[in-house]
Amino acid sequence: MNKQNNYSDDSIQVLEGLEAVRKRPGMYIGSTDKRGLHHLVYEVVDNSVDEVLNGYGDAITVTINQDGSISIEDNGRGMPTGIHASGKPTAEVIFTVLHAGGKFGQGGYKTSGGLHGVGASVVNALSEWLEVEIHRDGNIYTQNFKNGGIPATGLVKTGKTKKTGTKVTFKPDSEIFKSTTTFNFDILSERLQESAFLLKDLKITLTDLRSGKEREEIYHYEEGIKEFVSYVNEGKEVLHDVTTFAGHSNGIEVDVAFQYNDQYSESILSFVNNVRTKDGGTHEVGFKTAMTRVFNEYARRINELKDKDKNLDGNDIREGLTAIISVRIPEELLQFEGQTKSKLGTSEARSAVDSVVSEKLPYYLEEKGQLSKSLVKKAIKAQQAREAARKAREDARSGKKNKRKDTLLSGKLTPAQSKNTDKNELYLVEGDSAGGSAKLGRDRKFQAILPLRGKVINTEKARLEDIFKNEEINTIIHTIGAGVGTDFKIEDSNYNRIIIMTDADTDGAHIQVLLLTFFFKYMKPLVQAGRVFIALPPLYKLEKGKGKNKKVEYAWTDEELENLQKQLGKGFILQRYKGLGEMNPEQLWETTMNPETRTLIRVQVEDEVRSSKRVTTLMGDKVAPRREWIEKHVEFGMQEDQSILDNKEVQILENEKYIEEETN
């Protein structure tokens, strides 16, 4: 590719020093937990992706090494190796000075992800050690850093090479990442696979060299976002082949791919310069506006909508739609709303996407007449269903107080005394007997109890109007009081935490899954905000002695049980809990409800695409994918009820025996 290489020493601009990064890492990577740890990798990978995005290189390799460090290698141009205007080697400037990156000069990149340039130095500052190896101009150069970014060597020429590119290896600092410095293959694979879908020329290889965890995955999609849509819709009944539109407008490149399926919810994923905009923005608005306008015009042209009929709503048109919107915006036009860069603010992007879709979609609808007519009819059906559900939703919102009173009068909800919605907790408890113990054992100031008596509907396969007919779900909607579906407003929630408390058996697990499916599909902001939890009652109670000498201990896993048995010695009584109802109110409070001693699992969505696919696989209509997934992931043994804590894949995100973060 014959391009002028303007990625030179003087195109790197220096803005400020690095001192603040180690003091306040959260300002730069969001957090110092598992999420922040993996963010370090994305920062380096995004620099390599920017090279590919601008036409240099086509391969990135990410390797988790045996010692727990990680290497990211690309075949781009290689970082500049000369002396910077400040008098230091340019590579050293890139890795030791905040905001020293190609993005900030005009010569380096035409388009790049929003954080490019900050990445390298922040990663260095938060690493125990870092090593960079550069292949450029026929030479290999290396430089080492230690103790959070201090140069251990200068930039040294170490050999000859015929290739170009950059390799960065680093080990995260355990003083910063106190909870974990262990990389998770699956978390990395989700983000890397996404990048490969968005850049069809790019091949990404992810390798794990750690003992007992060895594996490798390669991501390379020649059809790009077309394959991305197929991936998201896997396991669903699709109504047509994936459709793609591409075009330019206002200097912005637009790529759109979409496909309808037989489900009732929409899934729109948008990206700017290969970075996910999870909160949408102007590009999504442009897509939705054009789609709604073109569909309504077409529906009137084929006489499915008469003059007296009102226009179809965008939500109705998008029912069952999966779409990927990818835009590439020149650096000078790039604007985000807020600090997180998760919502695009560039106004030109709206008109760019609108004009590309408005130009191409009418031709597509005309060409696929039969399909288009069925999609219009599908939208009209959705409109009718929405009207039916609207009344129920209005009851849920405008009649909130009356309904809440009705719920109280019907004896279901035992409310908290406090009106402090920032502190109040709602326990959804399986069955009446456990609900009774929970009512007596709770802290009535801030804990409310809602026993679930009947059958919870599988919301993956149901329309909203049917969901409102399910008494258990309806009661939950009214109790939380923040609406449902597209009307859900997290700020209206009556509770800061929703805690699901069920027996530790297969029925309990099934209820958990049904409730989580509902929250994921119809109250997603609650899950995204980390406000849905699963309570973890103990599996065993051990008792020894009598009267004043009586000792009572609880165990949550077989390992804990073994340790307690050794500690207590002989002569103890062991009780295996089969259900919550076997505990008296004091025991339930002490083990499962007391913020000082309880253990909660916070339900978190790391990757919405994969979570959504998993929900479809496990809760959808198709039996074969479900059987295949269960055979691959579930081990059937002789143990009747194994603790969830024994599963190494489940992360206990909040063990409140040790930490309890209260909002005052």
Swiss-Prot record:
GO molecular function, one term: ATP binding
EC nos: 5.6.2.2
Binding site for Mg(2+) 2: D503, D505
Annotated CDD domains: HATPase_GyrB-like, TopoII_Trans_DNA_gyrase
Enzyme class, UniProt record, top EC level: isomerase
One Pfam family hit: DNA_gyraseB
Keyword Nucleotide-binding set for record: yes
Disordered: annotated span: 386-418
Cofactor(s) this protein cannot do without: Mg(2+); Mn(2+); Ca(2+)
Swiss-Prot/TrEMBL site (Interaction with DNA) positions: K455, N458, H510, R626
Binding site for Mg(2+) 1: E430, D503
Record InterPro entries: DNA_gyrase_B_C, HATPase_C_sf, ParE_type2, Ribosomal_Su5_D2-typ_SF, Ribsml_uS5_D2-typ_fold_subgr, Topo_IIA, Topo_IIA-like_dom_sf, Topo_IIA_B
Family matches, as SMART domains: HATPase_c, TOP2c
Residues the entry annotates as binding ATP: Y7, N47, D74, G114, L115, H116, G117, V118, G119, A120, K341
Domain Toprim: 424-538
An annotated GO cellular component: chromosome
Keywords from the named record: ATP-binding, DNA-binding, Isomerase, Magnesium, Metal-binding, Nucleotide-binding, Topoisomerase
Listed Basic and acidic residues bias regions: 387-398
Catalysed reactions listed for this entry: ATP-dependent breakage, passage and rejoining of double-stranded DNA
GO biological process: chromosome segregation; DNA topological change
Known role: Topoisomerase IV is essential for chromosome segregation. It relaxes supercoiled DNA. Performs the decatenation events required during the replication of a circular DNA molecule.
Assembly and binders: Heterotetramer composed of ParC and ParE.
Family: Belongs to the type II topoisomerase family. ParE type 2 subfamily.
The protein's name: DNA topoisomerase 4 subunit B
Organism, as annotated: Staphylococcus epidermidis (strain ATCC 35984 / DSM 28319 / BCRC 17069 / CCUG 31568 / BM 3577 / RP62A)
